[in-house]
């Protein structure tokens, strides 16, 4: 699952054989922000390992869910991109905006295409 937030961009998966989630990021500080603000139980960040996402940490399903609930309860903004720009800077907002624009290609697709 991809998650774009005002504290970072994450890819969350459960790897085969694991009972916990792996939270992956392209920027190490995104995991630091997530850990500091919403998920103190998130493991230390592991760097590298020759994978698509250079930074990763692990957490239980339950603690991840609790952290996401906290993050959702903190939503007070009326414009996501403006809040991203305010909290994370204009460069991050531009990357998020490009992703949003690219996802517009989904409009008009039918189920299964």
Identify the function of each model-found stretch.
Residues 1-113:
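Structured alpha/beta or helical-core interaction and ligand-binding surfaces enriched in interleaved
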């Amino acid at each position: 699952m991809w998650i774009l937030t005002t504290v970072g961009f994450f890819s969350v998966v459960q790897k085969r054989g694991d009972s916990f989630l792996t939270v992956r990021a392209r920027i190490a500080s995104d995991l630091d922000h997530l850990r500091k603000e919403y998920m103190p139980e998130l493991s230390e960040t592991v760097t590298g390992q020759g994978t698509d996402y250079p930074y990763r940490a692990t957490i239980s399903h339950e603690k991840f869910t609790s952290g996401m609930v906290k993050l959702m309860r903190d939503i007070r903004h009326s414009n996501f991109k403006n809040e991203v720009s305010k909290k994370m800077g204009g460069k991050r907002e531009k990357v998020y905006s490009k992703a949003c624009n690219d996802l517009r290609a989904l409009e008009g697709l039918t189920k299964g295409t």
